[in-house]
Amino acid sequence: MADSLKMGNLSLNESQHAPAAPPSNGRAAYIPPHLRQRTMGANVDGAAASPPGPAPGAGAWNGPRNAPRGGNWANANASDFSPRGPNVPNGNISWTPTETQRRPFNPHAYGHPGHGGSYGGSHGSAKGSGDGQWRDGKHIPGPANARLERELFGVPNDPTKQSTGINFANYDDIPVEASGHDVPEPVNAFTNPPLDDHLISNIKLARYQTPTPVQKYSIPIVMNGRDLMACAQTGSGKTGGFLFPILSQAFQTGPSPVPAQASGQFGYGRQRKAYPTSLILAPTRELVSQIFDEARKFAYRSWVRPCVVYGGADIGSQLRQIERGCDLLVATPGRLVDLIERGRISLVNIKYLVLDEADRMLDMGFEPQIRRIVEGEDMPNVNERQTLMFSATFPRDIQMLARDFLKDYVFLSVGRVGSTSENITQKVEYVEDHDKRSVLLDILHTHGTSGLTLIFVETKRMADALSDFLLNQRFPATAIHGDRTQRERERALEMFRSGRCPILVATAVAARGLDIPNVTHVINYDLPTDIDDYVHRIGRTGRAGNTGIATAFFNRSNRGVVRELIDLLKEAHQEVPSFLESIAREGSGYGGRGGRGGRGRGGNATRDMRRMGGNVGGGGPSFGGGYGAPSGSSYGGGAGGYGAPPAYGGGYGGGYGGGSYGNPSGPTGPSSWW
């Protein structure tokens, strides 16, 4: 019965995602020769079997390719529109026939991976990476692949690949504060030195012309061997800030030797245990997938092979991609602990440890897993590796924990971190709950179809209900939340990115870290109870110097964040509605929490605690309350430490469960908290 269900979900496009590495069920993936030729022709010659959707900014939701282009949403219910149904061809899959050819084992490159899809179980195949070699102490890049370059880097003016926006030049005016001794001077261009020539060529392919402020400082800091804690505005290039120097040094120094105790583990050109030299940890599967895509891009034609592992996807396919070679590993903490327990990953060779969205990982209860990975396994100690922490906010307690992970670090604060970008026009509307749908329709009709619209709600049920409502109103919408399967989430994101479905209703899963080009409007249908979450939600627009609009529906049920919301609006020079100020004056008892567990953003969320003379060793103030009554835990009492709460009670989409946050091997089983 299970086989028949799996067969029912197969499509021609899915079978193309891994031509070089057939899945475990060979019968399900078999394609007759005549269909292979037809499929290849559709991709090569452009005669796709099903019509693609319009690019972002197109005038309408289009039907068949030869249908007239309209200027409205009239075709939202066209026969090929199925944002929540199974097996929607995305029209963007490219298949390189030569990738299926068998290649001899290359001891310098660990073998050649199969072709992975955009996301999902075969996501980590890293096609194009690992094609280079390290021979006689030199990096020899692999051959160019025009088709793969188009897939990774797009073409000029490709709406799905965003580099810079109209306000990018204004980034030079953003203040930068670097603290620590002997801070290296910033760089103003992608040049050699300090960067490797091959990395610079890939940066040019991505059409990046000038480093962002965080990149100007992080590149020389990391290249000089220093640890780094970096705070920067969301959308300011943090991913490149750690990938560029890590990959550059990898290209210059080559791979690390496999430990002697690993001898005998090799067979047929593979090894059962991977020994990555770089580890990047991030809280969500979507974020690690995005970082992996960037790593593939900038490791193109190099000897470095990136891999990605996360919960919710088939662990068998992830194990197979690791066996083919893993030099740079992007992972969620839960799945990484699982693979370490299985004896499939060793951290003994780690040179670089990156904690991306570090505050969110600790906030969501990943601290025990992170401490086990960093301190309880075979990872080199803090003095034998470089550790980089990147996020948009670093509250005081997070900085106190950083003392255990970093040594003699440089603290980098770029701009008004923890606040919002002035590239975003913020609007706050007073809307009662029963009026939200009608106001939303008015906004969507007013702003038309240009760009992408991201709508945030608090619960999974609301996400589905609102997307169904918009579909009934002839607006092409889809939803993403934790109750949807991994493939459904991947398909929804792909359709949204490509503009085929330009409205996405999301829970907190997409609130932080995801870099989706051309999001021109973010709507907080349900305001979060935490002002930091609001900052990161609206940060999905106005990225890389582009402009965007953020609209928030506010009523008295949101008065807990009114004071911080007013402060944010003033900081970003936005209009403050009079009703916000009147509600804020109603009583001091409503003052916002300011942050999770009452910690507060305060005035020091972006300041280096080492310069403030504070006691960072315990004995600090109590961070009372914890994360909700059900857990029975609180932050620290008077000792200033984490209480490792086992549950988080209520919040995004029906509660945080047992603290597994996207970790199917955690206490919640196959479900994730969002």
Swiss-Prot record:
Compartments it resides in: Cytoplasm
Biased region (Low complexity) positions are 57-68, 662-674
Q: Which reaction does it catalyse?
A: ATP + H2O = ADP + phosphate + H(+)
The reply on keyword Amino-acid biosynthesis is no
Question: Where is composition skewed (Polar residues) in this entry?
Answer: 89-99
CDD domains listed in its UniProt record: DEADc_DDX3_DDX4, SF2_C_DEAD
Motif DEAD box residues? 356-359
The processes (GO biological process) annotated in the record are:
cytoplasmic translational initiation; negative regulation of cytoplasmic translational initiation in response to stress; positive regulation of formation of translation preinitiation complex; regulatory ncRNA-mediated gene silencing; spliceosomal complex disassembly
Chain segments carrying region Disordered = 45-143, 585-617, 653-674
> GO MF annotations for this entry?
ATP binding; ATP hydrolysis activity; eukaryotic initiation factor 4G binding; G-quadruplex DNA binding; G-quadruplex RNA binding; mRNA binding; RNA helicase activity; RNA strand annealing activity
Keyword annotations of the record:
ATP-binding, Cytoplasm, Helicase, Hydrolase, Initiation factor, Nucleotide-binding, Protein biosynthesis, RNA-binding
EC class, as a word, reads hydrolase
Motif Q motif — list its residue ranges.
188-216
Q: Which residues are listed for ATP binding in this entry?
A: 232-239
Q: Where is the composition biased (Gly residues)?
A: 113-131, 588-603
Principal subcellular localization: cytoplasm
Q: Where is the Helicase ATP-binding domain?
A: 219-412
Q: Which domain of life is it from?
A: Eukaryota
**Domain named Helicase C-terminal: which ranges?**
423-584
> What does the UniProt record say this protein does?
ATP-binding RNA helicase involved in translation initiation. Remodels RNA in response to ADP and ATP concentrations by facilitating disruption, but also formation of RNA duplexes.
This protein's domain notes: The Q motif is unique to and characteristic of the DEAD box family of RNA helicases and controls ATP binding and hydrolysis.
Q: Which PANTHER family match?
A: ATP-DEPENDENT RNA HELICASE DBP3
Specify the protein name. Answer: ATP-dependent RNA helicase ded1
Source organism of the structure: Aspergillus fumigatus (strain ATCC MYA-4609 / CBS 101355 / FGSC A1100 / Af293) (Neosartorya fumigata)
